[in-house]
Amino acid sequence: RGMWLGLGGLAKGMIGDEVIRLLKQRGIKSCRYRAGGDMVFGDAPPGQVGWRVTVPDLWIAAGEREAKPLTFTAANSAASVSGDVYRFVEIDGVRYAHVVDPRSGLGVTDRRVSCVRGERGIDTDPLATAGLILDETSWQAALARVPGCRGDVAPVRR
């Protein structure tokens, strides 16, 4: 009675993998799971090459002076987005993300959004979170250690 279960960390990505597996096992091949910033995709919708995904808060360079929201198509894969756009606390004018930097014990203050795409939600979920904490070189090295994963990170443009 009164129990609260938080699905932070890598739970949402891992659960997504299992949901899609179970749906496919029951004959539902074209499916998509989303919980927070975590998405896992089954087969593409009928007549489509994949599920169209736009990450409105992650703007990537599209030219020398232009930027546009990250958009991609996904099927039989996973994607996770992490950032402080919706979950944060402001204390004395400083915005702290819900993601805690283990080096300081405080919420991350560098306003970024990261998106990782890969084969499984259990991989993309924690790597997207790491994109908010690690410097670019360390994050790219972490991505390289997980086959099939790639990511984008950018400052929040709000």
Question: What are the roles of these predicted feature ranges?
Answer:
Residues 1-158:
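Mature catalytic core of soluble alpha/beta enzymes
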